[in-house]
């Protein structure tokens, strides 16, 4: 069984060389040069969180300079947040700059979304992107899952998720993550597989296929036997 954590902010040093999991570590642009030396087994997503999109011109400029690095395999996390962060007239242009980078470099987009489903829905329809857009830490309800799935969003689930929404997330649109939680990626797999009433090996196999399709350059972990 191969384990993939497509969005995490923390890799414990003792887990850095764990051969049984492969992670995509989320970093800010100015953190990347140090992180790529510290975490040599892992790949990165790099972007500016919507909470910090105000006065982000320098980080955006630097992101555009480093985002072509092959160790950066996704752009973000970026996105829209109605609860925290600057006004949307600041967040939206920064988000759209990430969309442009994603398309230019042909790298998937990792999206943070809080109560901004309608805006994201319309921005995606307008942008008509060629690259995958992944809603990380998705906790939306079944109606939101169905709506966003129809226009091509992918979904990454972590420790907390809406059980009812799983019915409306296609198997080939599902990913797993730990984000900032203290549980392991194996525990996330086990939770979701249990809700879906799927064998853990079968579930992990489907997630592996999804990851390898969307992130073809991501290093494969060794198989974990449980």
In which residue ranges do the predicted regions lie?
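Mid-domain alpha/beta scaffold segments of enzyme catalytic cores
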Residues: 1-226
């Amino acid at each position: 069984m191969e384990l993939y954590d497509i969005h995490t902010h923390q890799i414990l040093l003792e887990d850095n060389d764990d051969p049984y999991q492969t992670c995509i570590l989320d970093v800010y642009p100015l953190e990347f040069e140090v992180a790529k030396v510290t975490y040599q087994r892992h790949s990165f997503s790099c972007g500016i969180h919507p909470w910090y999109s105000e006065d982000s011109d320098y980080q955006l400029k630097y992101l555009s300079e480093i985002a072509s690095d092959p160790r950066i395999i996704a752009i973000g996390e970026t996105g829209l947040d109605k609860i925290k962060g600057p006004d949307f007239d600041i967040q939206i242009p920064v988000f759209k700059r990430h969309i442009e980078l994603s398309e230019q470099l042909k790298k998937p987009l990792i999206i943070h979304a809080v109560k901004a489903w309608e805006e994201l829905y319309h921005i995606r329809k307008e942008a008509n992107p060629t690259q995958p857009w992944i809603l990380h830490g998705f906790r939306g309800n079944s109606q939101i899952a169905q709506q966003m799935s129809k226009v091509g969003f992918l979904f990454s689930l972590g420790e907390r998720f809406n059980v009812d929404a799983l019915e409306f997330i296609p198997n080939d649109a599902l990913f797993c993550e730990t984000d900032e939680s203290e549980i392991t990626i194996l525990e996330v797999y086990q939770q979701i597989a249990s809700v879906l009433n799927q064998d853990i090996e079968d579930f992990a196999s489907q997630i592996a296929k999804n990851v390898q399709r969307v992130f073809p350059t991501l290093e494969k972990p060794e198989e974990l036997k449980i």
